[in-house]
C-alpha cells in the first residue's frame, strides 16, 4: 500500500548476490534496494553508511544469538548500538530487507515495524552523519526519523522530548526500566505491576540550575552535559557527566537492563571511553541492586532483610500469586512481618501515599485487605501510609533512620499452598458422627440440599463464576486496589448520594476514611455489565495519565461489581457546553481550548503510548470529566477495544453512542484508532459551537452542525460556527482557526484522511501546520441512509420535531450514525 512504511519479518530464503556482497550504500538508499544479512556478510551485515562513515545501518547480531539479527544503527568504530527497529523480534540471516519501487520498506512475513506517513511517498532513506535514520518524501520533507523513536540510547544532539520514552531491554528478573519527561521533570521508573519511580533529575544533587522556574519539556546531550529546556528552548538545567569539555566529541547515554544510565564518549575514530558518572550515582539507588527483599548497603553489600530472614530461611515470601484463592474459594493464609529497623525503600520519595493522617493499625489493615499489596511503609511523623504491589531491594537508611516502619506480607508457615486434603480430613469425622447418630438427619440434609440446588441454581453456580473472575483479575498486571463491598458501602453512606446514571449502572459519591473523595460506579445486571467491569479494570487499572480518569480501585465480591474512581468535582463536559438555561456558567475560549487539548493528549496516550493500542470506542462529552481546574480526563472504558501493535484494523461488534460513531461502524468496515479520532472531532465541534451536532430545533441549514461547519468553511466564514454566547473571542487568535480546521479534519469520511491523535495534538499546539481540509459536507449520506431508515423503523431513532428538511437524506449520515447501543 502506498504511503505506509512497513518493516516485516519473514522466513523466506534469499540466496546471496555475489555481485553486491559486502558493498554498502553511502548516505542513502532509494526504491529498488533489497538484500539480506547474507548479501552483506563481508561488511558485517551493514548495507547503509553515513556520508562520514561514522555510522552504519543493517543487520546486527543480538547478544543472545549469533544467528539472529536486529535492524540497527551502530557507531562503526566502537560497535556501540544507537537504535534498533526490531529489538523484540530479531530476524534470520536470510530475511530480506526491501525498499520497493512504491517507496515502501518491507520484509515479507510478520509485521514488526510500521509507520503512518500521512499519505506521502518515500523517495529515499538517509543515514545522516548525526546517526539519525530518516525516511524522506518525494518533496524532500522528513516523514519519519529514528531520533523521534529512541530505544535504550540517546546520542549527542538528539532531542529527547516529553512524550518519548527510553526503555531498557528486560533484566534477568524480567523487569524493564523506563526514562521519560513527565510533569516538568525527567524520571526513571521500574515497570513492575504499577510503575515505581526511583530517580528524578529534579532531585539529583548533580543538577545545575541555570534558570529558576520554567517547565522542562525536552533535553539533549550537548558537549559534556545533559541540558534541559523549556518549550521555548530556554536552558533551565544542566547535568555535567564528564570533565572532557571538547564540544566536538559525540556522547551516548544508555539505559541498561540494570536500571542504570551510563555515558560513553564515542570519540573521533577512536574506541569509546566510558564516563565514571552513572545515573543513579548511588550503587544501591536502583530497584534491584541485590534482588527482591534483600537490603543493599555500602558498596553494594547485600543481605536478606532481617524480618524476613527470621521468618523464612530462603529470603522469599512464599507468595507467587497474592490474589489467588484455594480450591474451596478461601484466601491463602498470609501474615505481615516487620522488615526490621534501619531500612529504606527507593520509591518512598516519589510515590503518593495510599492514605494520609492514619495510624499504623489502619495501614496494616489496608494492606491486609488488599490482596495485591506485598508491603507497606508507615511514617509516624505524618501518618502517611504507603502500599506497594512490587517490592524490590531495600537499602540501609543511615544513622538518622528513614522515619518509616515497614512490613512485608508473607505466606504463613505450613499453609501448604491451599491443599484441600486437610479440610477433607476435618470434615470426615463430622460426617461419620452424623451417620452414626441418625440416618434421619442425613435424609433431611439431603432434602435441603436438593431444594437449594433446584431453587437457587444461579447462587450455587456463583462461586465458579466468581473463581473464574478472580483468576481473570489475578492475572492482570498493575491491578488497582481491591475494596471489600462493605468498605464502599460505608464510603458512600449506603449509596445515598447519586451523581448520575449510565448504561450499565449508577454512580455515587463516596469518601474514604482518609478524607479522599470517590465516584463509585455500581454495575447493575449481567451480560454487558460484566464485560464492562472486566474491560474497565483491565484497561484503565494499569495505565496512568494526567488526562485519563484514575481508577482508585474495584470490588468483585459475590454478585457485587463496583468501580471506584477519583472524584472530579466539575462533572462531565456535557453539562458545561450544552447549557440548559441562560443562568448556567459559560466556558470561555481558553478553558474550552485547554479541554480540547487535554482530551486529545489522553487519547493519543491510549493509541500510541500503551503496551497495547487502546481504542476507546465511546468518546462523547458525557465521558470527558473535568477536575477543579477544568482539566479534562477521559473516562468510561467499558466499551474499549484492545489492539496489538501489529494490528492496524480490527473487526468488532458495533458499540458507542449515536451521533459520535465513525462511518466505518455503520458500513461494517474494520475499525481502528481513527474511529476515536472521528468521535473526538464531533466533540471538538460541539465544544467550539456550544451545541449538539444535531439539533432539530435549529433551521434546516444549521440543524446538522457538521454539514453547516463544512459549508461555512467553503464560504470562508468559519467564525460563524463559534458559540455566539462567548464574549470577547479574539478573531485573530490562531487557536480558534486551528481548532475548527482540526475538527473538520477529524470527521473526514475516509479514515485514512483523518490525522492520528498525536498529530491532532501537534495541530492544536501549532507545531504542525493545519491546512484547509477537504470538503465532506454530505457526510457520506449515501452510505448511511438505508441504515438510518432501518433503525427508524425499529424505533431506534427519534423523530425530529424541527423543520422537515432536517430529516432529508442529505442529513441522515451523522444524525443517528450508531443506531441503538
Swiss-Prot record:
Which Gene Ontology terms describe the biological processes this protein takes part in?
protein autophosphorylation
In its UniProt entry, the species of origin is given as: Arabidopsis thaliana (Mouse-ear cress)
What Pfam families does the annotation carry?
Answer: B_lectin, Pkinase
GO MF annotation terms? ATP binding; calmodulin binding; carbohydrate binding; protein kinase activity; protein serine kinase activity; protein serine/threonine kinase activity; ubiquitin protein ligase binding
Q: Which residues carry this modification: Phosphoserine?
A: 635
Span list, region CaM-binding: 581-599
- State the gene name recorded for this protein: SD25
Using the record's annotation, list all stretches that form the EGF-like domain: 280-314
Membrane topology (UniProt): Single-pass type I membrane protein
Catalytic residue positions: 618
Is Disulfide bond there in the keyword field? yes
What name goes with this protein? G-type lectin S-receptor-like serine/threonine-protein kinase SD2-5
Alphabetical list of PROSITE patterns matching this protein: BULB_LECTIN, PROTEIN_KINASE_ATP, PROTEIN_KINASE_DOM, PROTEIN_KINASE_ST
Give the residue spans that cross the bilayer. Answer: 430-450
Q: What is the lineage of its organism?
A: Eukaryota, Viridiplantae, Streptophyta, Embryophyta, Tracheophyta
Instruction: Give the Gene3D superfamilies listed for this entry.
Output: 2.90.10.30, Phosphorylase Kinase, domain 1, Transferase(Phosphotransferase) domain 1
Family classification: Belongs to the protein kinase superfamily. Ser/Thr protein kinase family.
- State which ranges are Extracellular (membrane side): 22-429
Amino acid at each position: 500500500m502506498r504511503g505506509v512504511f512497513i518493516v516485516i519479518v519473514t522466513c523466506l530464503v534469499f540466496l546471496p548476490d555475489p555481485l553486491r556482497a559486502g558493498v554498502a550504500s553511502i548516505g542513502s538508499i532509494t526504491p529498488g534496494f533489497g538484500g539480506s544479512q547474507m548479501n552483506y556478510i563481508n561488511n558485517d551485515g551493514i548495507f547503509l553508511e553515513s556520508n562520514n562513515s561514522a555510522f552504519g545501518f543493517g543487520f546486527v547480531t543480538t547478544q543472545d544469538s549469533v544467528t539472529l539479527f536486529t535492524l540497527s544503527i551502530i557507531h562503526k568504530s566502537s560497535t556501540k548500538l544507537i537504535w534498533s527497529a526490531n529489538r523484540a523480534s530479531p530476524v534470520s540471516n536470510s530475511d530480506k530487507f526491501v525498499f520497493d519501487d512504491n517507496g515502501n520498506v518491507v520484509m515479507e512475513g510478520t509485521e514488526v515495524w510500521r509507520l503512518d506517513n500521512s499519505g506521502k511517498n518515500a523517495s529515499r532513506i538517509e543515514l545522516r552523519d548525526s546517526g539519525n535514520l530518516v525516511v524522506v518524501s518525494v518533496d524532500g520533507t522528513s516523514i519519519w526519523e529514528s531520533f523521534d523513536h529512541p530505544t535504550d540510547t540517546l546520542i549527542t544532539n538528539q532531542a529527547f522530548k516529553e512524550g518519548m520514552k527510553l526503555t531498557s531491554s528486560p533484566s534477568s528478573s524480567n523487569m524493564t526500566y523506563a526514562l521519560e519527561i513527565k510533569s516538568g521533570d525527567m524520571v526513571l521508573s521500574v515497570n513492575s505491576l504499577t510503575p515505581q519511580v526511583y530517580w528524578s533529575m529534579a532531585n539529583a544533587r548533580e543538577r545545575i540550575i541555570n534558570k529558576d522556574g520554567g517547565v522542562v519539556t525536552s533535553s539533549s546531550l550537548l558537549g559534556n552535559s545533559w541540558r534541559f529546556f523549556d518549550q521555548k528552548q530556554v536552558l533551565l538545567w544542566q547535568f555535567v557527566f564528564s570533565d572532557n569539555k571538547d564540544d566536538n566529541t559525540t556522547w551516548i547515554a544508555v539505559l541498561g537492563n540494570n536500571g542504570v544510565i551510563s555515558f560513553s564518549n564515542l570519540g573521533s575514530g577512536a574506541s569509546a571511553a566510558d564516563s565514571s558518572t552513572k545515573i543513579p550515582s548511588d550503587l544501591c539507588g536502583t530497584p534491584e541492586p541485590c534482588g527482591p527483599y534483600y537490603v543493599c548497603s555500602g558498596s553494594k553489600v547485600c543481605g536478606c532483610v532481617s524480618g524476613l530472614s527470621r521468618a523464612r530461611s530462603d529470603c522469599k515470601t512464599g507468595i507467587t500469586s497474592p490474589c489467588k484463592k484455594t480450591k474451596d474459594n478461601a484466601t491463602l493464609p498470609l501474615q505481615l512481618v516487620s522488615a526490621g529497623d534501619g531500612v529504606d525503600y527507593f520509591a518512598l520519595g516519589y510515590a503518593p501515599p495510599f492514605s494520609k493522617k492514619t495510624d499504623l493499625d489502619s495501614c496494616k489493615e489496608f494492606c491486609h485487605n488488599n490482596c495485591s499489596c506485598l508491603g507497606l511503609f508507615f511514617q509516624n511523623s505524618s501518618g502517611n501510609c504507603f502500599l506497594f504491589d512490587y517490592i524490590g531491594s531495600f537499602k540501609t537508611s543511615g544513622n538518622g533512620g528513614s522515619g518509616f516502619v515497614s512490613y512485608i506480607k508473607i505466606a504463613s508457615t505450613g499453609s501448604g499452598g491451599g491443599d484441600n486434603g486437610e479440610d477433607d480430613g476435618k470434615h470426615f469425622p463430622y460426617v461419620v458422627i452424623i451417620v452414626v447418630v441418625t440416618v434421619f438427619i442425613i435424609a433431611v440434609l439431603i432434602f435441603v440440599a436438593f431444594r437449594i440446588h433446584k431453587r437457587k441454581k444461579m447462587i450455587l453456580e456463583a462461586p465458579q463464576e466468581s473463581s473464574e473472575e478472580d483468576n481473570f483479575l489475578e492475572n492482570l498486571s498493575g491491578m488497582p486496589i481491591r475494596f471489600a463491598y462493605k468498605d464502599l458501602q460505608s464510603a458512600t453512606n449506603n449509596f445515598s448520594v447519586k451523581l448520575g446514571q449510565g448504561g450499565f449502572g449508577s454512580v455515587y459519591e463516596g469518601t474514604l476514611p482518609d478524607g479522599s473523595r470517590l465516584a463509585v460506579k455500581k454495575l447493575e445486571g449481567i451480560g454487558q455489565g460484566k464485560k464492562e467491569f472486566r474491560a474497565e479494570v483491565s484497561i484503565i487499572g494499569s495505565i496512568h495519565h494526567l488526562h485519563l480518569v484514575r481508577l482508585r480501585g474495584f470490588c468483585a465480591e459475590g454478585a457485587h461489581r463496583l468501580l471506584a474512581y477519583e472524584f472530579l468535582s466539575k462533572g462531565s463536559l456535557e453539562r458545561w457546553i450544552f447549557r440548559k438555561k441562560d443562568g448556567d456558567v459559560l466556558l470561555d475560549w481558553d478553558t474550552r481550548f485547554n479541554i480540547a487539548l487535554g482530551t486529545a493528549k489522553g487519547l493519543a496516550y491510549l493509541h500510541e503510548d500503551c503496551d497495547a493500542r487502546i481504542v476507546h470506542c465511546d468518546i462523547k462529552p458525557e465521558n470527558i470529566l473535568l477536575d477543579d481546574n477544568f482539566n479534562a480526563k477521559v473516562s468510561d472504558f467499558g466499551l474499549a477495544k484492545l489492539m496489538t501493535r501489529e494490528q492496524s484494523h480490527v473487526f468488532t461488534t458495533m458499540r458507542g453512542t449515536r451521533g459520535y460513531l465513525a462511518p466505518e461502524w455503520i458500513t461494517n468496515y474494520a475499525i481502528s484508532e481513527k474511529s476515536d479520532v472521528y468521535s473526538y472531532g464531533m466533540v471538538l465541534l460541539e465544544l467550539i459551537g456550544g451545541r449538539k451536532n444535531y439539533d432539530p430545533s435549529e433551521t434546516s441549514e444549521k440543524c446538522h452542525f457538521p454539514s453547516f461547519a463544512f459549508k461555512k468553511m467553503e464560504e470562508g466564514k468559519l467564525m460563524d460556527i463559534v458559540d455566539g454566547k462567548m464574549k470577547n473571542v479574539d478573531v485573530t487568535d490562531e487557536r480558534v482557526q486551528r481548532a475548527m480546521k482540526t475538527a473538520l479534519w477529524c470527521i473526514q469520511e475516509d479514515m485514512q484522511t483523518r490525522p492520528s491523535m498525536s498529530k491532532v495534538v501537534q495541530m492544536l499546539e501549532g507545531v504542525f501546520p493545519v491546512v484547509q481540509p477537504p470538503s465532506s459536507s454530505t457526510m457520506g449520506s449515501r452510505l448511511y441512509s438505508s441504515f438510518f431508515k432501518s433503525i427508524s423503523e425499529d424505533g431506534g431513532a427519534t423523530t425530529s420535531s424541527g423543520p422537515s428538511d432536517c430529516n432529508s437524506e442529505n442529513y441522515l449520515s451523522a444524525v443517528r450514525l450508531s443506531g441503538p447501543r
